[in-house]
Amino acid sequence: MLLPKRTKYRKPHKVSFKGKAKGAKTINFGEYGLMSLDGAWIDNRQIEAARIAMTRYMRRDGKVWMRIFPHISMSKKPAEVRMGSGKGNPEKWVAVVKEGTVMFEIAGVSEETAREALRLAMHKLPVRCKFVKRGEE
């Protein structure tokens, strides 16, 4: 699972995913990419599931770049606990994805293979996505 080696704060404030992305809007590494059409918190399990779906379909051909990383911990209180008494324990790690963020990039495979691999990854993510090519973002 993806998680940071160390963080400055154990329980940060929630970061908003509303609005459009400021960076990571273009394809920088690969030939094809997966761009988000919504904003959301994407946790480390969803990112890993999408990566595995892509690499299994491509059968170790090509290269995959993950442009998002889960830096922020999300806390949650246990079930049936009364309100108050502080913030809950860190439950999972999330990446903040805004509208227009390129989340994954692929190179070294044909366009139809890349399109299908990224389609499989789309089903693992909680945001609407679209397939983009280099230079057509």
From Swiss-Prot:
SUPFAM superfamilies: Ribosomal protein L16p/L10e (SSF54686)
GO molecular function, one term: tRNA binding
An individual GO BP term: translation
Top-rank lineage group of the source organism: Bacteria
rRNA-binding is among the record's keywords: yes
InterPro entries recorded: Ribosomal_uL16, Ribosomal_uL16_bact-type, Ribosomal_uL16_CS, Ribosomal_uL16_dom, Ribosomal_uL16_sf
Protein keywords: Ribonucleoprotein, Ribosomal protein, RNA-binding, rRNA-binding, tRNA-binding
Gene Ontology annotations for the cellular component aspect, listed alphabetically: cytosolic large ribosomal subunit
Cited function: Binds 23S rRNA and is also seen to make contacts with the A and possibly P site tRNAs.
Similarity section: Belongs to the universal ribosomal protein uL16 family.
HAMAP family: Ribosomal_uL16
Subunit structure: Part of the 50S ribosomal subunit.
NCBIfam families linked: rplP_bact
Protein name: Large ribosomal subunit protein uL16
Organism field: Mesoplasma florum (strain ATCC 33453 / NBRC 100688 / NCTC 11704 / L1) (Acholeplasma florum)
